[in-house]
Every structure is written in structure tokens, then in C-alpha cells.
């Protein structure tokens, strides 16, 4: 039985079990959303595979895949929607291509979902889904859409719809940029490099989350503060409803707002309280970037006004022929053509005269002029984006060669490099927003929407991240292919908009919003030179992130032991110990200053680089310099680093045979190093096990590390063949494996990245 889910509930449940994959290929994803609302008239309900809810409608349990032949699949593709044997309730089963009750018709005109087996319609009965004859009730009305994602990963923030008296935007932030728990959540002005904005309600510290603070004078209004992550705590779980209100799962009728006057009071505290109405602007928030374009192209198509017969067709054909100087009698077919001037067409339409045989030319003139105006502005937006993107990659080959020389890698070799294209381009958009928050989100809006559009438009429905493993000799070709794909995605998205009246109208509206509105596509007054400079530096950093692990790793010495540091250019020290960057096979050969200057002089965080946080993925070796005894055998060992590239805090347990080496926490977008010394055997293969769970103790992945010691050599390290088991919803990327050194006495290192599948 399938349920309608109230967004006041929460769960970590997903499909109960994985069955054999179906063979029918999904076409696109959508979420079926009922127009029926809860008793508070704020909370919407969604079609869901679970009897509880997970924060927002884009979660996997509420995302569905519609195949060309009318099957409705769960997001994983393992189950289809069917009518139960009793002919009343709806259930999830395996695909049966001969069953008509598994085939549905989505009527976007009347907002109905009809079963082809019995002719009945999807309906609601006490929050359960069933099928019933057509009855005209609102409970049979559904809107199909694909909600644009809210910011994920290590970027994005939430800003209030309320402006101050000087039209400045303000967003959720942490008092004094504190990284300590139990700190007040306040409003801060949206400005460049304000890094303590909230992202997915997990701070940049990794495990601090938004929580409910004390009540204000014993009322039902509460302060908000930061706190450590607590498993299954509904007070730390949040959702966004259709009114752009951020509600709490424990108090579903209470939403985040603020008390005080923006720009006047020295501190404006954020609170959890009851909105005065669904339109209370002090309780409405915008996720920046908004991906408003992604949302537009996900909506139900809306055709242009039809002129298909009689006088209507004759008038349209005459005007088209006149405007295009006889080129075509269907002017709309040229909206996507790059070889025509829509501006000239507009002039011709405006100056067109009406012969006696044409009776309704004026009506057509106004409609086609509007269409041309919309199309001209939409094309201009995408032309500006294409110009920015082309310039960003115009020096790609030269820049890559120069970096390779600094990092000392041979670009003609067959050495393998790991990369993630999405991470690279996302870092560019994040840099632009960080430096130019007012307006910078426009570039991110287009770029991220184009990327999402391309993924959904692809023939395959791959759920993994955009990671790749390629030889250095083929790296540039691979990057160039990614660049061309991104340009093609933007082009296809533009053409989709230009061929749809509803999408084109809505996109045109965004072109004239104020630039400080995150949904805006208004590029008037843009400083593209500044944007390009910021983007170029960000992309350069992304290329360094990709190439650096091919020749360098981090050498970690725990606090209290000697570490030979002679320059801050290649070292970092904190309370846990000293981190030194050096070549993989020589711990005494450090990166040149010309390379490190490209990092530290461009604002890159040393902590992030040396601890492999966010976009940095350097494997870490453990070494005890000039030590004897057990530490002198460090070369026999290998030490794992688990990189958590998700928004879910994790931990992993390392066991060496019957010995439990330790439990290690891994914050979101951080890396966790198992630096605890353990016993190793003699020559040959030795194994230790890694079990990764999320902070709620749900399994993520299990694997065995093979630590192979040969005579007078440092250990070779790898993941044991066939040992990797990954839970649904996660992907384990290509590990970075570096050999230890017998002569220099350092351990082997292995970094294992874990992603959330899309």
C-alpha cells in the first residue's frame, strides 16, 4: 500500500528491499504532488513509497520515473506502481510487462493519473493512495513536476525574502561566524566571502547542525542555535513547504523567521514561530542558487497558441512569410536557429500591413511580437553564458600543461588520474557566488540547471556521481569533451525553452527581476571581466585538486613527535599533529613555491588542503621521523583515509583480525584518517576490514584493505577484490593507493571517497 505523506513527519526509511532491476528504461523523473493539503492549510502532501517523510519532495522516496510505455517506477527503478489484487489500494511490485494495471496515463490537462487496467483514477483515502472512479474531488487532482534541488554539498545559503530599507538581502548565519556549538543563529547581510552561511543546515564545520534553542518567555516561540548532530532527533530535521517556509519536523506548524529590523538592530535573531499567514514574508526564504531555470524546464509543457486551420492558419502563415522575407511560413520554427536575426523579424512584424484577405493580422502581430521579444531575451541570456563558459575554457590546454610542469607529471604518460567534473565546475560557480553573491547566482543558476538538464536528458539513467578515471595522456581530451557536453546541455535547455510558450514566458519574466533576486536572469550591468577572473582562478584550483594527488601526498606526524618542517609553504600544524606535503615516493621532496603560491595567495584554506576536506583528495601517509622500535616498522603498514563527499556525517570502524583498531568520525565533506598504530605480520598479504556507517548507524559500505609487504619494500595497498559492499544510495569512488617506503620509513596510504548517488 502506498501512502500520501504529510511533511510534518520524518524518516530515514527507503524501499524495504532491492529486487531485480527492471528492463524498461525510464524517460524522466517526476514527483507526483497532491493538491490536497493538511488541516493547517500550510502543509502539502506528496505521493511517497514510505509511510513517513524525508524533509523535501526531491528525496528519493518521493521521486518517480515515468517510462515511455506508461510505467511509473520508483527512483531506483526496482519497483513499479500497480493496483493491488483487490482492485482498491496501490502497491509497489516488480515489473510485469503483460499487466495493464501497471500502466498509467498522466493527464496534465485535467491533472489526473488514470490506471489503464481498470480505468480508475489515483485518489486519496485517509492519507492512503487508492484508485476510484472519476468523482470530481480535489483528491484526484495531481500536479507532476520535478522540484529543483536546494543547495547541496559545501555551497549555497538561505536568504530571507524580506529586504532591509536599503534593499539589501539578509541570510541565515551564525553569530560571529562561530564554529562552536550552542551558538545563536542570526541574520547577516549577504555579502562576499560570508562563509558561515547555512548549507543544508549543516555548517562548514562539518557536524554542527541547526537546532531549536530555548523558549522565549515560556511561549511557543523559540530561539535557534547550533548543536552537535544527534541521531534521529526531529528537532534537528527541517523541510521546505510550498510557501518557501522552513518548518521543523518536531513542531510542524512552526517555521523559521526572525525578530527585529534588518539593517537597524545590531543583532537580529532567528526564531522558530508560527507564521501569521502563508504569505508572511518574514518567514519566507530563498535557497541560493535557486536553479529557477531547472524548475521551469521541469514543468508540464505549454504549447504556443494554436493557429492550425482556416483564417487563423492563413493569417499566421502570411505574417511568418512577410516577417522572414519569404524564408518560411512558420516563424516559430526559427526561434532556435542561430543563423537568423530575431531582431529583424521583430521589425518586420511591427511594420507588416494587412491585405484584404487577412482579417486578424493585428491579433497575430501582438502575439508574435511578444514571442519574439521573449525569444530575443532568452537567447541573449544563454549567449552571455556561452561567452563566459567559452572564455573560461579557452586556455584550457595551455593552463593544463603549465600546471603539469609545476606538479611534475608527464601529460603523455599512462598514469591514471581521478576526477569529478561536477565538483570542478560546481567549485567555479561557488567561487562566483562567494565573491559576487548579488548577481553571481545567475551564472550558477544557468550552469547547474544545464548540468541537471543534461543528466535527465541522457539516454541512460546512471545514478552515480560524475567521477572519472582517465590516463594523463587523455585527460585534456576528456575535459574538452566535458566542456562540449556542458555547452550542448545549455544549448538543448535553451532550445527546449524556446519551443515552449510557458517556459519561454516564465524565463522572460526572470530576465527582468532585480539582480539581487537569486531567481533573476537579469545580466544588465554585469562585470563579466570580474566574473571571468574569479571563475578562472576557481577552475585553476580545481585542476590543481585533480592533478596534485598524482605526484603528492600528505605525511602526517602525530602531535608530540618530531617533524622536519622548514617552510610553511608545504606544511600545516594543528592540535592533532603536523601535516607535510611531499612527493609520493620521496617524503623529502616538496612542491615548488610557484605551485603553492597559486594556492595560498589565492585564498585556498591550508586546513582544507592538508586534511583533504571539500575538493581536496590527497591520500595521507603516517610517519614517525627518526624513531626506533615499533615505529621503525611503519613501512610495513598502510593507513586508510575515508573521504565523506556527502551531507551525512559518517564514521568507520577499522578492525585488524580480531583486534578493533578504532572508530573514526568523518564529518561532511571532510576526510577521516585512521592514524592509530596496529600490528602487522611478516612478508605477504595482510588484511584489515573497514565498516562505514552514517551517524545514525545505518550501513554505508564495507570493504577489506589488502596490505601486501614484499622484501625490502614498503607496503603495497589496495581494496581486496570482491570485498566491496555498498548500500543503495551511495557510491564508492576510485581509491587513491600509494606505496609505502622501506628506505624512508613511511607507511602506504589509501584514500577511499564515498559519494551520495544522485
Curated annotation (Swiss-Prot):
GO CC field: cytoplasm; membrane; nucleus
Q: Which family does it belong to?
A: Belongs to the cup family.
CDD domains assigned: beta-trefoil_Ricin-like
- Disulfide bond residue pairs: none
Which protein are we looking at? Calcium up-regulated protein E
GO BP terms in the entry = response to cation stress
Primary location recorded for the protein, binned into one broad class: cytoplasm
Please explain the role this protein plays, according to its UniProt record. May play an important role in stabilizing and/or regulating the cell membrane during Ca(2+) stress or certain stages of development.
Q: Which Pfam families match?
A: Ricin_B_lectin
Q: Which cellular compartments is it found in?
A: Cytoplasm; Membrane
Q: Does the keyword Disulfide bond apply?
A: no
Any GO molecular function: carbohydrate binding
Induction (free text)? Induced by high levels of extracellular Ca(2+).
What domain of life does the native source organism fall in?
Eukaryota
**Membrane protein topology class:** Peripheral membrane protein
Q: Which gene carries the instructions for this protein? A: cupE
Q: Can you name the source organism?
A: Dictyostelium discoideum
* Keyword set, alphabetical order: Cytoplasm, Lectin, Membrane, Repeat
Against InterPro entries, the record matches this protein to:
Ca_Up-reg_Membrane_Reg, Ricin_B-like_lectins, Ricin_B_lectin
The UniProt record lists the keyword Repeat: yes
Q: Where is this region: Disordered?
A: 1-22
Q: Which residues form the Ricin B-type lectin domain?
A: 25-145, 156-288
May I ask which residue range the UniProt record assigns to the signal sequence? Answer: none
Amino acid at each position: 500500500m502506498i501512502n500520501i505523506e504529510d511533511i510534518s513527519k520524518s524518516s530515514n526509511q527507503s524501499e524495504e528491499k532491492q529486487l531485480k532491476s527492471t528492463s524498461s528504461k525510464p524517460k524522466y523523473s517526476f514527483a507526483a504532488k497532491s493538491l490536497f493539503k493538511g488541516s493547517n492549510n500550510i502543509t502539502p502532501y506528496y505521493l511517497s513509497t514510505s509511510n513517513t517523510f524525508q524533509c523535501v519532495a526531491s528525496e528519493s522516496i518521493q521521486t518517480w520515473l515515468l517510462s515511455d510505455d506508461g510505467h511509473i517506477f520508483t527512483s531506483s527503478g526496482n519497483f513499479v506502481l500497480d493496483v493491488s489484487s483487490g482492485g482498491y489500494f496501490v502497491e509497489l511490485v516488480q515489473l510485469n510487462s503483460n499487466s495493464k494495471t501497471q500502466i498509467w496515463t498522466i493527464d496534465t490537462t485535467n491533472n489526473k493519473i488514470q490506471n489503464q487496467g481498470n480505468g480508475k483514477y489515483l485518489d486519496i483515502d485517509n492519507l492512503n493512495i487508492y484508485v476510484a472512479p472519476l468523482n470530481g474531488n480535489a483528491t484526484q487532482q495531481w500536479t507532476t513536476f520535478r522540484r529543483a534541488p536546494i543547495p547541496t554539498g559545501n555551497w549555497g545559503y538561505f536568504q530571507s525574502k524580506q529586504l532591509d530599507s536599503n534593499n539589501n538581502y539578509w541570510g541565515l548565519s551564525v553569530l560571529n561566524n562561530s564554529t562552536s556549538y550552542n551558538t545563536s543563529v542570526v541574520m547577516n547581510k549577504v555579502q562576499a566571502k560570508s562563509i558561515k552561511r547555512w548549507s543544508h543546515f549543516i555548517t562548514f564545520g562539518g557536524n554542527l547542525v541547526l537546532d531549536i534553542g530555548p523558549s522565549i518567555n515560556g511561549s511557543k516561540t523559540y530561539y535557534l542555535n547550533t548543536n552537535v548532530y544527534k541521531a534521529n532527533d526531529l528537532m534537528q530535521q527541517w523541510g521546505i513547504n510550498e510557501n518557501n517556509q522552513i518548518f521543523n519536523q518536531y513542531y510542524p506548524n512552526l517555521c523559521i523567521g526572525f525578530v527585529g529590523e534588518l539593517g537597524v538592530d545590531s543583532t537580529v535573531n532567528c526564531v522558530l514561530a508560527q507564521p501569521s499567514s502563508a504569505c508572511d514574508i518574514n518567514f519566507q526564504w530563498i535557497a541560493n542558487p535557486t536553479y529557477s531555470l531547472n524548475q521551469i524546464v521541469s514543468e508540464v509543457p505549454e504549447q504556443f497558441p494554436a493557429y492550425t486551420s482556416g483564417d487563423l492558419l492563413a493569417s499566421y502563415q502570411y505574417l511568418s512569410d512577410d516577417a522572414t522575407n519569404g524564408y518560411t511560413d512558420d516563424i516559430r520554427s526559427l526561434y532556435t536557429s542561430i543563423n537568423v536575426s530575431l531582431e529583424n523579424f521583430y521589425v518586420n512584424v511591427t511594420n507588416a500591413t494587412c491585405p484584404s484577405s487577412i482579417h486578424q493580422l493585428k491579433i497575430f502581430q501582438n502575439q508574435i511580437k511578444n514571442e519574439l521579444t521573449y525569444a530575443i531575451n532568452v537567447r541573449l541570456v544563454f549567449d552571455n553564458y556561452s561567452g563566459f563558459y567559452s572564455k573560461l575554457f579557452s586556455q584550457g590546454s595551455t593552463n593544463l600543461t603549465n600546471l603539469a610542469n609545476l606538479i611534475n607529471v608527464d601529460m603523455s604518460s599512462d598514469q591514471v588520474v581521478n576526477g569529478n567534473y561536477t565538483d570542478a565546475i560546481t567549485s567555479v560557480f561557488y567561487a562566483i557566488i562567494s565573491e559576487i553573491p548579488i548577481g553571481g547566482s545567475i551564472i550558477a543558476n544557468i550552469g547547474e540547471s544545464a548540468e541537471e538538464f543534461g543528466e535527465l536528458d541522457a539516454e541512460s539513467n546512471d545514478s552515480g556521481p560524475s567521477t572519472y578515471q582517465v590516463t594523463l595522456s587523455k585527460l585534456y581530451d576528456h575535459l574538452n569533451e566535458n566542456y562540449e557536453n556542458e555547452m550542448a546541455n545549455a544549448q538543448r535547455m535553451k532550445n527546449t525553452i524556446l519551443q515552449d510558450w510557458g517556459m519561454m514566458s516564465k524565463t522572460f519574466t526572470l530576465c527582468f527581476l532585480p539582480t539581487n533576486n537569486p531567481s533573476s536572469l537579469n545580466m544588465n550591468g554585469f562585470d563579466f571581466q570580474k566574473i571571468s577572473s574569479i571563475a578562472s582562478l576557481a577552475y585553476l584550483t580545481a585542476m590543481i585538486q585533480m592533478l596534485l594527488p598524482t605526484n603528492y601526498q600528505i605525511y602526517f606526524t602525530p602531535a608530540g613527535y618530531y617533524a622536519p618542517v622548514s617552510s610553511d609553504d608545504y606544511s600545516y600544524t594543528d592540535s592533532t599533529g603536523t601535516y607535510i606535503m611531499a612527493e609520493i615516493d620521496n617524503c623529502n621532496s616538496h612542491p615548488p613555491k610557484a605551485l603553492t603560491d597559486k594556492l595560498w595567495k589565492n585564498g585556498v584554506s591550508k586546513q582544507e588542503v592538508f586534511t583533504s576536506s571539500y575538493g581536496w583528495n590527497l591520500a595521507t601517509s603516517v610517519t614517525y621521523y627518526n624513531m626506533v622500535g615499533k615505529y621503525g616498522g611503519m613501512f610495513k603498514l598502510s593507513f586508510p583515509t575515508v573521504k565523506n563527499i556527502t551531507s551525512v556525517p559518517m564514521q568507520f570502524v577499522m578492525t585488524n583480525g580480531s583486534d578493533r583498531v578504532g572508530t573514526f568520525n568523518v564529518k561532511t565533506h571532510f576526510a577521516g584518517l585512521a592514524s592509530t598504530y596496529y600490528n602487522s605480520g611478516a612478508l605477504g598479504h595482510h588484511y584489515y576490514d573497514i565498516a562505514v556507517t552514517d551517524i545514525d548507524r545505518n550501513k554505508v559500505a564495507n570493504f577489506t584493505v589488502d596490505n601486501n609487504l614484499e622484501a625490502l619494500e614498503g607496503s603495497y595497498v589496495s581494496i581486496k577484490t570482491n570485498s566491496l559492499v555498498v548500500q543503495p544510495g551511495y557510491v564508492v569512488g576510485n581509491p587513491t593507493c600509494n606505496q609505502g617506503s622501506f628506505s624512508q620509513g613511511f607507511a602506504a596510504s589509501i584514500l577511499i571517497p564515498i559519494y551520495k548517488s544522485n
